[in-house]
């Protein structure tokens, strides 16, 4: 590992550790997303507590946390495998942010942002897959899982040299969603737009 690659990995983690959801909610004087709703500091929970505009702002900021370091590494000619580590570092920062007591989100938006520099065609395929699954089934977690499982295949079809880094990133996202997988099989996973029906639902972790 070169010093440049190591520097980009550290930068990616620190950038990922900036919790967009928490900061935007503070600016808009909304409740801390870590304490209400699903208690997940991501766009899905912010949509629930703050509406569409706040959620879109969080989504875009979370995506940029993945795009900026990976794009930077891409233009600095960092090899594909190391770019995968940069992307993973950004997502780990989002999931376990050092600036916010290591309590972060699921990393889906940040992962999408990290994949974006590979190509607009890949980004469009990934986003279309997520949207179709959400529209058909209304499970954001299912959409995220289906999307990340297909993302390595899409990458192989478009730019095969990035298949391994994308697969590494997708494995991290799947592992982060293990509780969602359990709830999907149990039939207890909340759908997009549903409100919490009881206090225990606050313990649920949503995606994005």
Swiss-Prot record:
Membrane topology classification: Multi-pass membrane protein
UniProt GO MF annotations: acyl-phosphate glycerol-3-phosphate acyltransferase activity
Stored SMART domains: G3P_acyltransf
BP terms from Gene Ontology: phospholipid biosynthetic process
Main location: membrane
EC number: 2.3.1.275
Subcellular location: Cell inner membrane
Pathway: Lipid metabolism; phospholipid metabolism
Keywords on record: Cell inner membrane, Cell membrane, Lipid biosynthesis, Lipid metabolism, Membrane, Phospholipid biosynthesis, Phospholipid metabolism, Transferase, Transmembrane, Transmembrane helix
Enzyme class label: transferase
Catalysed reactions, as listed in the record: an acyl phosphate + sn-glycerol 3-phosphate = a 1-acyl-sn-glycero-3-phosphate + phosphate
InterPro entries: G3P_acylTferase_PlsY
Transmembrane segments: 4-24, 56-76, 80-100, 117-137, 139-159
GO cellular component: plasma membrane
Protein purpose: Catalyzes the transfer of an acyl group from acyl-phosphate (acyl-PO(4)) to glycerol-3-phosphate (G3P) to form lysophosphatidic acid (LPA). This enzyme utilizes acyl-phosphate as fatty acyl donor, but not acyl-CoA or acyl-ACP.
Database matches in NCBIfam families: glycerol-3-phosphate 1-O-acyltransferase PlsY
Subunit structure: Probably interacts with PlsX.
Family: Belongs to the PlsY family.
Name of this protein: Glycerol-3-phosphate acyltransferase
């Amino acid at each position: 590992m070169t010093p440049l690659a190591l520097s980009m990995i550290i930068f990616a983690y620190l950038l990922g550790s900036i919790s967009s959801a928490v900061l935007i909610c503070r600016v808009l004087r909304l409740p801390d997303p870590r304490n209400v709703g699903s208690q997940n500091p991501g766009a899905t929970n912010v949509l629930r507590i703050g509406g569409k505009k706040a959620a879109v702002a969080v989504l875009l900021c979370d995506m940029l946390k993945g795009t900026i370091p990976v794009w930077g590494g891409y233009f600095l000619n960092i090899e594909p495998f190391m770019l995968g580590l940069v992307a993973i570092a950004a997502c780990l920062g989002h999931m376990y942010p050092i600036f916010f007591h290591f309590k972060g989100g699921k990393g889906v938006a940040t992962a999408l942002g990290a994949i974006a520099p590979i190509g607009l065609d890949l980004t469009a395929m990934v986003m279309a897959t997520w949207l179709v699954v959400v529209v058909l089934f209304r499970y954001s977690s299912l959409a995220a899982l289906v999307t990340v499982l297909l993302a390595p295949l899409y990458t192989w079809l478009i730019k095969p040299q990035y298949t391994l880094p994308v697969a590494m990133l997708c494995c991290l996202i799947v592992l982060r969603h293990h509780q969602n997988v359990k709830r999907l099989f149990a039939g207890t996973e909340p759908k997009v737009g549903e409100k919490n029906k009881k206090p225990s639902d606050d313990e649920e972790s949503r995606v994005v």
